[in-house]
Amino acid sequence: MVTIIRNADVYAPEHLGRTDVLLLGGTIAAVGENLKADFGGAVKVTELDGSELILTPGLIDGHEHIMGGGGEGGFHTRTPEASLTDLTLNGITTVVGCIGTDGVARHMESLLAKAKGLEEEGITTYVYTGSYQVPVHTLTGSMMKDIMMLDNVIGAGEIAISDHRSSQPSFEEFARIAADARVGGMLSGKAGVVNVHLGDSPRMMDLILRVVRETEIPYSQFLPTHVNRNEALFCQAIQFALEGGTIDMTGNEDIDYWETICDEVRVSTGIRRLLDAGVSDDNFTISSDGQGSLPIFNAKGEYQGIGIGKASSLLKEVRECVQRENIPLEIAIKPVTSNPARILKLSSKGRIQPGMDGDLCLLRKDDLTIHTVIAKGQIMVRDGKPLVYGTFEKRG
């Protein structure tokens, strides 16, 4: 399987300008002008014309409920699984699955099985061990053992704090989770990060900050998510990032509506504020929370209604960064490509350079929508339409 993308405007994520990219199997073999691959006709060479397109790394969604989530409004509010094309049609070639509120009917066995299924269908998958609950629900009985011995497991999450749905973990419990995740990661060469769900409580990131300040565990051990869920939390997140921490913003396809009922910070606005505050463009990511529930609670914590996160929010947020905030594309795509790859130690992901995995997106120049998606060297989407479907997805 040999593919050459000709004369695309390449963002690696750095802007390389117009050039060619050669894929051999599932790997990027070369980046440069006028590349050739002549096998005397023994191997089929597919050429894609990128002259009117932008080429970026495949998107990395670092927080998605791939097997579904939710349930805060009862059994009928359990959200559905992600299908393959839910991801690929939105440029996502690598996804990190997690479990949220429901750590009873959703469990690690099912999460890993779903991840492996998506992997067999053509994309790359990882998972966090655990859920909102503490003690952490694991597969092997040990969080450290899950991270060290299970290939797909790269950290713990999403552990909930500052939320009425959390287990209200003590400082000691939370510090132990971070310590065990850290050692599990060290022993296996993985990130071992703790993906921390942040709720609306005014305690915000207090537990994380206590661990960093009162123990030997560094900022890099944590990836707090949903930091844009309200204004006060986002202000604290800016300071956290200025001090060297990394933060994750949650995309929202329906932000125009949510801005009318709460003070959630629009991702593109948040990124502009981070940059203006002097935060490094290496220190933040965007994830979709796809297939996760978006429950609405009143001031008493009573359930009022529910929505669902969408994988499509990832690329939508990149577009808004460019189109609403005039953020250069080479910066706007870092939170969904090279940044999560570095933070999560996905060493072959997130960049366009020789030796990296053949995960690529071709975007239309005028509106940054999906034209072609390639995962591990295989063309999954072309002309905005899927070529590869999930096992039980309806064709056409």
What does each model-identified segment do?
Residues 1-3, 10-56:
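Histidine-rich, glycine-flanked metal-binding segment
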Residues 25-28, 352-396:
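C-terminal cap of metal-dependent C-N hydrolases
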Residues 276-362:
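His/Asp/Glu-enriched, well-ordered alpha-helical/loop segment
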Residues 70, 74-77, 81-97, 146-167, ...:
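Active-site gating loops and adjacent loop-to-helix segments of metal-dependent hydrolytic enzymes
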Residues 82-135, 151-164, 186-201, 220-225:
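Divalent metal-dependent hydrolysis catalytic cores, especially in the metallo-beta-lactamase
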Residues 42-45, 50-113:
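Metal-associated gating/positioning segment near the N- to mid-region
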Residues 8, 26, 52, 63, ...:
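Divalent metal-coordination and catalytic microenvironments
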Residues 179-295, 303-304:
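Active-site core of metal-dependent hydrolases
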